[in-house]
Amino acid sequence: CLHPLVHLPAVKLRRHVEMYQWVETEESSEYTEDGQVKKETKYSYNTEWRSEIVNSRNFDREIGHKNPSAMAVESFTATAPFVQIGRFFLSAGLIDKIDNFKALSLAKLEDPHVDIIRRGDFFYHSENPKYPEVGDVRVSFSYAGLSSDDPDLGPAHVVTVIARQRGDQLIPFSTKS
């Protein structure tokens, strides 16, 4: 389960996880001193939401800019094991092509846990989402291939499939070029 409160009739549901982390920016410049070209490198540090772990061990100044080494929860995409159009099942190759993801509004969901705060379309694991600290995590969701009309999400998504029939399955069709 991607999240106990998030379930919907869609082909795919994606959980996108970001962590607030230190990021190092390197700026180099060359100058001439006593007839020799020298290079000066300046490092600056700021914090950003990132979906990948930023390894702070390689920073020029790691002290005071240390990031966690792992995320408590990972990004993940769940895909329905069986997808039908009419009486035909889509092959895995066709299901893979359904990737027009739309952001899922979390407005009508409750905060799932005392340690989790919902702000906008994110769940935050943070003391205060307005003022995040390094190591705080936020999670958003998106979906693709809405399979039926939904009062909150709108009409079912229209998917155009060019395929070949094999029994009760639709499989990718390719022309000889």
Please report, for each region that a protein language model flagged, where it lies by residue.
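Charged, low-complexity helical/coil segments in non-catalytic cytosolic or luminal regions
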Residues: H7-S177
